[in-house]
């Protein structure tokens, strides 16, 4: 019998799932963040942004990149733009409309709860990108420009000419480099994750292969990556 993968999606109405989850989730005391180690596999737009954000929050982050540099991630290929429900054009946009268009654009194959969460945080993502220095196109008055793109019902696409993916990745890479310099993130380039270390059903580490030496490095916990079981970061 095939085991169904648990998606870990919270219970409840779709518009309330993540709000209720955040309201009842456990918190981390700011003084304890530096004691917690987090492994982020991948340095594309998602991985680099996550590693940089977690490092800036005070966690100890170990970031693994399969390429020579995070700038070689495929996120650079995105051209058209990035959508958010800011409704700058006053054309009736909303979180639900962005959610609906995204699910429909994905041929109804996406997990709807996760897409709704994406729509909820879309405005925050744009704010984060602007803070990272992404040069989005702007109107003559200085406000961020929008255009209608793809299957969207309204004008909600933020863009940087035809180089949106490249500019987003460079912004995330700059934020990541800042945290690497600050010592909160350790970056390991030319490493490929082979497997996840599970302890009682929970991910506690990874098995990574150095693509230069072809040696395997194992870790029962993220903290061991910073000691004798992993080489110093590149």
Residue ranges and their predicted role:
Residues 2-20, 25, 30, 66-204, ...:
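Conserved N-terminal/central alpha/beta ligand/cofactor-binding core
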Residues 34-36, 215-216:
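Core beta-strand elements of the Rossmann-like FAD/NAD(P) dinucleotide-binding domain
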Residues 38-63:
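N-terminal Rossmann-like FAD-binding beta1-loop-alpha1 element of flavoenzymes
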Residues 41, 74, 155, 225-228:
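A detector of low-complexity, intrinsically disordered, Ser/Thr/Gly/Pro/Ala-rich segments
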Residues 43, 161, 215-216:
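Alpha-helix N-cap/helix-initiation motif
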Residues 47, 70, 225:
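Flexible, glycine-rich phosphate/dinucleotide-binding loops
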Residues 217-224:
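Conserved small/polar residues in nucleotide/adenosyl-binding loops
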Residues 228-234:
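Hydrophobic alpha-helical segments, chiefly the membrane-spanning helices
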């Amino acid at each position: 019998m095939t085991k169904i993968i648990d998606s870990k999606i919270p219970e409840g109405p779709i518009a309330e799932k993540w709000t209720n989850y955040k309201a009842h989730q456990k918190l981390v005391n700011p003084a304890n963040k530096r004691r917690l180690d987090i492994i982020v596999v991948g340095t594309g737009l998602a991985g680099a942004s996550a590693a940089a954000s977690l490092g800036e929050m005070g966690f100890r982050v170990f970031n693994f990149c399969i390429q020579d540099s995070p700038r070689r991630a495929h996120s650079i290929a995105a051209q058209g733009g990035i959508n958010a429900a800011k409704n700058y054009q006053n054309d009736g946009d909303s979180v639900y409309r962005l959610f609906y268009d995204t699910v429909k654009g994905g041929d109804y194959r996406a997990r709807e709860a996760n897409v709704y969460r994406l729509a909820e945080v879309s405005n925050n993502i744009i704010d984060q990108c602007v803070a990272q220095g992404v040069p989005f196109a702007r109107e003559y008055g200085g406000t961020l420009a929008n255009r209608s793109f793809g299957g969207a019902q309204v004008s909600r696409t933020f863009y940087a000419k035809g180089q949106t993916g490249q500019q987003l990745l460079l912004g995330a890479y700059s934020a990541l480099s800042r945290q690497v310099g600050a010592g909160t993130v350790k970056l390991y380039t030319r490493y490929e994750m082979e497997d996840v270390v599970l302890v009682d059903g929970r991910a506690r580490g990874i098995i990574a292969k150095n693509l230069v030496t072809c040696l395997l490095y194992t870790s029962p916990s993220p903290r061991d990556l910073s000691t004798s079981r992993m080489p110093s970061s590149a």
